[in-house]
Amino acid sequence: MEYAHIMPEDIFKNPEVKVYVEAGNSCLGALGFTEHGRPHAKRCSNYARNILEALDYDTRTCELAAIAGYLHDIGNTVNRVDHAHSGAIMAFTLLTRMNMPPEEIAIICSAIGHHDEKTAFPVNAVSAAL
């Protein structure tokens, strides 16, 4: 099966992603949290990519970190509680629909699912950077 080579820019400009990022930001705003919209998503994307680049990881791993960084808070659309887990499931659905290779989806979803401040654990390089 032929899979798509999804780049961070594909995620940044995806209209569905924009809706989820902004919906999560709206939910958090109602709960009294600071900004968690596209500026936050882009900062996290850049930080995750830059960390792995500084550690000399390969280009694709750095790109996957950028994607995970951008998507990491979309689960706030569902609820702040367990947002890492719901976000990983949302990312799985989105990236599968975009035809990303399962091996890459697994890395991204693991990173998102393990990023919560209470249950975080660095299960791979991308999750450590995130």
Where are these regions (language model features)?
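Histidine (H) residue identity feature
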Residues: 3-5, 36, 40, 83-85, ...
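Non-catalytic interface/linker regions that flank or bridge core catalytic/transmembrane domains
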Residues: 1-20, 27
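Alpha-helix N-cap/helix-start motif at coil-to-helix transitions, marked by capping-box chemistry
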Residues: 11-18, 35-42, 59, 85, ...
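Divalent metal-dependent catalytic cores for phosphoryl transfer on phosphate-bearing substrates
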Residues: 30, 54-130
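Active-site flanking loop/helix segments enriched in acidic
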Residues: 18-53, 70-77
